[in-house]
Amino acid sequence: MAKHITSSEYDAVIATAYCYVEAMEKGSSKRAKEGFHPDGGIYGYVDGEFKGGSISNLFDFLDQSPEGHKIKAHLDVIAMTPTTAIVKTEVEMNPPETDYTDFLGMVKIDGKWQIVSKIFHSYPR
């Protein structure tokens, strides 16, 4: 079988990653839940301290965040197969004055791309 991934598949992966970016902008988990698998995980560093666990931790953080974050984001698909993808996001968020680098691990399940892992590092300004 030849390795071939269509541009529409890349677009679908980026659209799934934008569920996360838009959730950060809105301060609501509703949009994030459209992109993340319910059993997903999150691991990374906040203020130099390792944090990790269920993706529900991110949902709680989003729901406790005030609405109206100004976000600048750059997304790159750094690796992709027909059923897996890794997306790197560079996010600048105000307020709070924090930047993030995220690596979103995705799997295509029943024809739909879902984020199953978020590995991140935060950079307070």
Swiss-Prot record:
Write the record's keywords in alphabetical order, separated by commas: Isomerase
Highest taxon, organism lineage = Eukaryota
**Record's InterPro entries?**
NTF2-like_dom_sf, Put_lumazine-bd
What reaction does this enzyme carry out catalytically?
(2S)-3-(4-methoxyphenyl)-2-[(3S)-3-(methylamino)-8-oxo-1-azaspiro[4.5]decan-1-yl]propanal = (1S,3S,6S,7S,8R)-7-hydroxy-6-[(4-methoxyphenyl)methyl]-3-(methylamino)-5-azatricyclo[6.3.1.0(1,5)]dodecan-9-one
Q: Which Pfam families match?
A: Lumazine_bd_2
Pathway, per record: Secondary metabolite biosynthesis
> For this protein, what is the EC number?
5.5.1.-
Question: Which portions of this protein are annotated as coiled-coil regions?
Answer: none
Give the protein's biological function: Aldolase; part of the gene cluster that mediates the biosynthesis of the alkaloid (-)-FR901483, a potent immunosuppressant that shows efficacy in animal models and a probable inhibitor of purine nucleotide biosynthesis by targeting phosphoribosylpyrophosphate amidotransferase (PPAT). Within the pathway, FrzH is a new kind of aldolase with no similarities to known aldolases, and which catalyzes the intramolecular aldol condensation via formation of a C9-C3' bond to yield an aza-tricyclic product.
Indicate what this protein is called per its UniProt record. Aldolase FrzH
